[in-house]
Amino acid sequence: MAPVDIPDRDRLIVALDLPDLRVAEAMVDRLGDSVGFYKIGYQLAYAGGLPLARALVGAGKKVFVDLKLHDIGNTVARGVESLSHLGASFLTVHAYPQTMKAAVEARGSSKVKILAVTVLTSYDDRDLADAGYRFGVRDLVEARARQAQAIGVDGLVCSPEEAAHLRSIVGPEMDLVTPGIRPAGAAAGDQKRIMTPAKAIAAGASYLVVGRPVLDAPDPKAAADAIVAEIAAARGS
């Protein structure tokens, strides 16, 4: 089972995959109190969006900084030290042992949780084979999850298709954060391993990352409300 002490609204993380700070701020205003948790990734971070993380935290929101750090240990450590001052709740690194160890050690006394990215949800077995991996997605995800837990990482970013299997491996304490969430009828886009919000929660996901189905909706606030309602129904809240 996923951790149970998370409010339904905070289980939805809206990905602010938007081109500039003004557009992102307008979307946050539009979503209002329907969303309490936001993800800032490459696109917005590199367009000057990291100050928005501080502003969101100051406004009582939670922030997930999704930069998927992957470099030599010292460089990752310095990056984590700098990013930890944003007040973010989550920070991602790629699930390589040296990277994970450096991140866990470098966060110090900050409250940021380190999440390890197992295998990107746009990858399938063929993609891994093309990249030279001997493992398929399932085996590689499992191996990386076990390493992450042993190192002391707080949670995993994984496909919702892997959530149930990983929950059986890592137990109830680790957070499972799942992108690749598509409400019924939504386009899959470039994601290959997707699931509806209700099914992902039932599979053991702790948090659901949703971007385009909210951002591109005619009424983003209503779209977010509908996903939170689906989460609540799946949990029997």
UniProtKB/Swiss-Prot annotation:
Keyword list, A-Z: Decarboxylase, Lyase, Pyrimidine biosynthesis
SUPFAM superfamilies: Ribulose-phoshate binding barrel
One record GO biological process: 'de novo' pyrimidine nucleobase biosynthetic process
UniProt pathway: Pyrimidine metabolism; UMP biosynthesis via de novo pathway; UMP from orotate: step 2/2
Catalytic activity, EC: 4.1.1.23
Record's catalysed reaction(s): orotidine 5'-phosphate + H(+) = UMP + CO2
Entry binding sites for substrate: 17, 39, 66-75, 121, 182, 191, 211-212
MF term (GO), any: orotidine-5'-phosphate decarboxylase activity
Active-site residues from the entry: K68 (proton donor)
Gene3D superfamilies: Aldolase class I
Pfam family, one: OMPdecase
GO CC list: cytosol
Disulfide bonds: none
Family (UniProt): Belongs to the OMP decarboxylase family. Type 1 subfamily.
Quaternary structure note: Homodimer.
Role description: Catalyzes the decarboxylation of orotidine 5'-monophosphate (OMP) to uridine 5'-monophosphate (UMP).
NCBIfam families from the UniProt entry: PRK00230.1, pyrF
Protein's name in the database: Orotidine 5'-phosphate decarboxylase
Organism name: Rhodopseudomonas palustris (strain ATCC BAA-98 / CGA009)
Source species taxonomy: Bacteria, Pseudomonadati, Pseudomonadota, Alphaproteobacteria, Hyphomicrobiales
Gene that this polypeptide is encoded by: pyrF
